[in-house]
Amino acid sequence: LSLDGFGCENMSAATCAAGALIYYLHETQKQEVQHIQSLRTYTTHSFVVLDADTLRNLELTQSMRDGSSKGSLLEMLDQTMTSMGARCLKQWLLQPHLKTDSINQRLEAVDELKSRISLQEELREALRQMYDIQRLISRISLGTANAREVLALKDSLRLIPSVKLQLEDCSAPFLIDLNQQLDPMTDLADLIDNAIHPEPPVT
């Protein structure tokens, strides 16, 4: 078995670490982790490496005064509508890009959204109604989700076409690419709709 197709050639230590992590998940979850179907390599060459002292001194996510998020850069910037957005913003702050093209694409996207107030408000309204899809998928994959959580996934998927529609006439490359990646998974949403009662019990 070779992982070279995933960009893991000459990365024996990383491959061993990934294997150990999968084994740990298998042992702790007491089942196959079938929802992990791909592997992506990560390199620090594309990002600024921030050590613990730098993170503390810049107060990116925690205040030096009491260690809480209050007063940190993250707390000031976080106007996200979803838990997924909050996690993404935190990751971007902790892993700043080094590539000029990537930085400029994000800036162009921010500029377009900032200049189009109606688009911004419509997107925020759709996202405000969305549940934490990443968390829901994880719970469903592990077999720990209840019926209401599966319905929450369906309700969130139903909002994606609206988001895609709002992004259709955007010109920023970052937003165009984002729109192309969004998949409403209509068949899955329909399947859930037909399989689960709209008002199931809690357990």
PLM features: residue spans?
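Charged catalytic and DNA/RNA-contacting regions of genome-maintenance
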Residues: 1-112, 121, 125-141, 145-203
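Short intracellular "coupling" helices and adjacent cytoplasmic loop segments at the cytosolic face
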Residues: 116-117
